[in-house]
Amino acid sequence: MTSHQPQPQEEQSPQRSTSGYPLQEVVDDEVSGPSAPGVDPSPPRRSLGCKRKRECLDESDDEPEKELAPEPEETWVAETLCGLKMKAKRRRVSLVLPEYYEAFNRLLAPGVDPSPPRRSLGCKRKRECLDESDDEPEKELAPEPEETWVAETLCGLKMKAKRRRVSLVLPEYYEAFNRLLAPGVDPSPPRRSLGCKRKRECLDESDDEPEKELAPEPEETWVAETLCGLKMKAKRRRVSLVLPEYYEAFNRLLAPGVDPSPPRRSLGCKRKRECLDESDDEPEKELAPEPEETWVAETLCGLKMKAKRRRVSLVLPEYYEAFNRLLAPGVDPSPPRRSLGCKRKRECLDESDDEPEKELAPEPEETWVAETLCGLKMKAKRRRVSLVLPEYYEAFNRLLEDPVIKRFLAWDKDLRVSDKYLLAMVIAYFSRAGLPSWQYQRIHFFLALYLANDMEEDDEAPKQKIFYFLYGKTHSHIPLRPKHWFQLCRPMNPRARKNCSQIALFQKRRFQFFCSMRCRAWVSPEELEEIQAYDPEHWVWARDRAHLS
């Protein structure tokens, strides 16, 4: 009886769980594997350098079996790059794309951004973006930033490249976020200059004023920081957007009536005294333009050059002369000029009032020359440049060795035709004629000496001796006036006529030599002293009429 009794009700009916749903009976011989429902029995796969990832959920048994995706192919990728060497490693390309992970996470937690957090190189995870409101429509996501290879270090011919990601968050988004947190405050981050602390923030503009358009960000450029031989070190510096006139306008508002320009100091001197303030009653005058600054070479050593910035003065020398002329009317305002290593020159002798004023020779130009040089310091002084070059002195000394000129100077013992001043005028005429020094010959010496006697001497007789030494004894008695040439040429023999034509040619050459000097035959006493000071010990300068007894 007992064996045929039915089983209790509890065993026949399925048990109910606490939630009210019946529990399914599990048959052991249906599927071999773990007893946990919904688990993929396939062995787990591990990625390179990571722990085991969780397997995807098994699809429902009711759905038809889908075609399996092909196995991923393996490819060779560059692992490291060092100079010209590259190490390649074989890795498998994953078939699971990132968008599948995002779709899975979106189903688990609706309304949360499913994209995985991104971490920058060498930093911790960045904070997640704030969740957008559920009421707003979903916006189109920005495309993923592309990664690129950038040069990390550069050493000789070796270059190390590193892959970095381009950030999608632009600086203006940070500024917009800061503007929402603190309205009325400039959201731009503080900028620090190189080697300095943070600059003070600009003053906040009034809330009543309309917001002005922001100036564009200054561009950065590479500038040469140091220069040593053929090596150059470049450093990136930012170009400032604040111009000097803005500082001056700010200072003008703080102290009206005061010159806002910063004081400028000369090299090795203290600050200059400030200009006196003009009267408030006078109208404001137009300010003179600021002098431009330029870079000049201070020192030069081999391939190295040290440049220093110096300011060009706006005060010209003629303004100093006009100022001195007002202080002492009737006095020459030009500063006294002294020759190199000599005392003041002797003043010119006063010419007679009855004589007409002669044409003055052009004054030589003045320039700045180095007076002393000590280390890196140089003292400059303004001196007058002589118009007579050294090659003309050499040409004059070369002609003094001519035998005809030697006999002529030895004959003139009374110094009536060739004293030291007349010979100095010969050197001045050589300089004014402008011929090369090697072209001056014996004829040019006598042409210049004849022209010097025309300017300084009134006696015509001594000049006839020039033709005696130049052409012979026949021409010592011939007058020098052109109106007598043709009268004297008729009774002469053919040889005398030939010599007479030579004298006419000499007079023609004398006029051409005078025109080559631009008709400037007068030489100032100062220039004669300078010519003699070039070589004071020369024997020619001993030919002085004052020493004759």
Swiss-Prot record:
Tissue: Predominantly expressed in testis and spleen.
A GO MF label: protein kinase binding
Feature: compositional bias, Low complexity: 1-15
Pfam family, one: Spy1
Superkingdom of origin: Eukaryota
Family matches, as InterPro entries: Speedy
Feature: compositional bias, Acidic residues: 58-74, 131-145, 204-218, 277-291, 350-364
PANTHER family reported in the protein's UniProt record: WBSCR19-LIKE PROTEIN
Family note: Belongs to the Speedy/Ringo family.
Name this polypeptide is given: Speedy protein E3
